[in-house]
Amino acid sequence: MRPAVAAALLLVAAAVAASPVSALYSAGSPVLQFNPNNFKSKVLNSNGVVLVEFFAPWCGHCQQLTPIWEKAAGVLKGVATVAALDADAHKELAQEYGIRGFPTIKVFVPGKPPVDYQGARDVKPIVEFALSQVKALLRDRLNGKTSAGSGGKKSGGSSEKTEPSASIELNSQNFDKLVTKSKDLWIVEFFAPWCGHCKKLAPEWKKAAKNLKGQVKLGHVDCDAEKSLMSKYKVEGFPTILVFGADKESPFPYQGARVASAIESFALEQLEANAAPPEVSELTGPDAMEEKCASAAICFVSFLPDILDSKAEGRNKYLELLLSVAEKFKKSPYSFVWTAAGKQADLEKQVGVGGYGYPAMVALNVKKGAYAPLRSAFQLDEITEFVKEAGRGGKGNLPLDGTPTIVQSEPWDGKDGEVIEEDEFSLEELMADNSPVNDEL
C-alpha cells in the first residue's frame, strides 16, 4: 500500500505543480479567460470595451492584482468586459502586443488600437478608466464616427469587400512625390500578389490603414510590377514593411506582429516620436495660406494688435500663448497662423474682424468655406476650449462669402515698430500769405 500511496501523492503533487498556479482565476471567476483560440472573436471582434490583463502565474504583482481585477470585473459586468490572458502559456500572442512585463493591462475599443492602462491598480481607478472609454465609444457612435457594431460581426457580406482601401497604391511615378519628399510619416508594405503571407496580411493592413487614416499614411507597392522600387529598397522577401520617418533616405523595417492592432499601436508610437515641434506661422501671403490652411482640418487664424500698440514684448507674449495652445493639439490635424492687424484686410472683412477688438481669432475651414469666431477672452483656457469645441464640430459656424484674398506682406522682423516722424512745421509759416506784394496802384 505504501508504494501505491506514495505514487498517488506524487501524482497529486505533479498535478498541483502543473496546474498553473494558472489559475489565478477559477472557472467561476467574473474575469473571463482568453487564449489564442477565442481572442479574435471575444476581443478584436467585440462590440464593446474589453480590458485584458496579460499575466504570468508566477508573478507576485499579478497575484496581488487578482482580487482587485475580479472585483472590477464584478462592478463592470454588463458595462465592459474584464478578462485575463496567461502570457506565460501563450507567449506568441503576448509578443504580438509587445508584452514585456507583468501584469500589463490593455484596453481594446472597437475601431481603435489598444491602449495601455497606466493608472493605479485599484478597483476605483480601473473602473473609472473603463467608464471613460465606454463614454468615449458612445459619444463616437452618437456623432456617427463609428457604427454600433464596428468591432463585431459584419453587417453585410459585400460592403466589406467593395470598400476601397485607405492604403495608397505607390509606384515609381508617385513614390518620391508622396513619400520621400513628404513630411508625413509613411509605413509602406512591399508585397507580391502571389505571396501567401501577403494575402494573409491584406485584411489586417486594410483595417490598420482605415483606422489610421488622417494620422499616419499607409501605402503598398506591388513588387512584381515595381522592380525598381523593390531593388532600391533592397526588398528580398514578402511582405516587407518599411517605415519612412523623419529621415526618408534611411527607412527601417517594421518587425512587429502582422495584425492591425499591433501595426496601429506601432504607427501611433512612431507618430509621437516623429512629431514635429508645434509652430505658429505668420500669414505672409497666398503660399503661406495654401501650405498652412488649405490642407488642415481646421486652421486657427489669430489677428494680433499692431506692433505699435503691443510692441515686440506684447506680441511675443501672444505668440507664446498660441504656441502653448498648439502644443496641446500637436497630434491633431490643425494649423495655427497669425497676422497683424490690418495686414490681411479682405480676410478680416470676411470673418468680421477689424477696426477694433484685437487680438481676435477664428477657426477657419477652407474646404467647407466656413468659419467660427472666438467669442471669449484671448486667454489660454478660453482658446483651448474654443479649439476643442471647433474639433467637435463647433457651434455657430458661419459661411465665408467667397475665397478671401490673401496679399503678400513682409514678415515681422521681431523688433518694435518705428514711429514715422513727420517734418515739423510752423503754424505761422502755414498761415502766412506768401503771395508777391504788388506796389502798383
From Swiss-Prot:
Transmembrane segments: none annotated. Residues 143-166 are annotated as: Disordered. Pfam families: Thioredox_PDIA6_C, Thioredoxin. Its EC number is 5.3.4.1. The record marks G60, H61, G196, H197 as: Contributes to redox potential value. Disulfide bonds join C59-C62, C195-C198. This is Protein disulfide isomerase-like 2-3. It comes from Oryza sativa subsp. japonica (Rice). The gene is PDIL2-3.
